[in-house]
């Protein structure tokens, strides 16, 4: 899917296996063996959490634009090109996905809306969906921030604190979760 979307571009895919118990690592190894120039695998011995996975991916990233995408297939790689355009043509440092129409239960949607409103108010960053895993960054942004603990939820704030003030958002499609929890 990513290969189809980015077919005519130079890109790399960095997979971070955060201590999965299924056959994720074997699949990553197969993908790397088939395309060692484009596919990088990082494996954790146990589950360290999303922030640690993002940090290791950011450390390994080499491309001019870095895109984060969760493996649960709720977000579509089809969105990458529009986000890339906002960075390259509109001058954004970071573009966050906004799941405007969510396919989650109310038990998740209501707390998410409250969290986003509070975070928007406290940070002064006009985003609707701080926690969307689909984001695009200039390489300089991911190299300037350090994501620890549960700080993946606050990456736009970390970026702003590091001097990257051009933060925008892109409405993205949201699918029901296919994998993971």
Regions found by a protein language model. Name each.
Residues 10-12, 38, 166:
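Residues at the starts of beta-strands that form the adenosine-phosphate
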Residues 17-26, 73-74:
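A conserved acidic beta->alpha catalytic loop
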Residues 31-35:
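Short, conserved SAM-binding/catalytic segment
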């Amino acid at each position: 899917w990513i290969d189809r979307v980015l077919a005519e571009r130079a890109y790399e895919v960095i997979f971070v296996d955060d201590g999965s118990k299924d056959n994720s690592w074997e699949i990553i190894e197969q993908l790397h063996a088939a395309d060692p120039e484009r596919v990088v695998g990082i494996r954790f011995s146990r589950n360290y959490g999303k922030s640690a996975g993002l940090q290791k991916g950011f450390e390994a990233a080499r491309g001019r634009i870095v895109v984060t995408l969760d493996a649960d297939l709720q977000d579509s790689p089809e969105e990458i090109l529009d986000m890339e355009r906002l960075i390259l043509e509109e001058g954004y440092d970071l573009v966050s996905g906004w799941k405007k129409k969510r396919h989650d239960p109310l038990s998740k949607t209501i707390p998410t809306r409250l969290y986003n409103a509070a975070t928007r108010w406290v940070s002064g960053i006009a985003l609707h969906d701080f926690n969307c895993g689909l984001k695009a960054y200039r390489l300089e942004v991911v190299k300037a921030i350090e994501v620890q603990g549960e700080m993946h939820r606050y990456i736009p704030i970390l970026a702003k604190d590091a001097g990257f003030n051009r933060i925008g958002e892109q409405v993205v499609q949201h699918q029901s979760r296919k994998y993971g929890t």
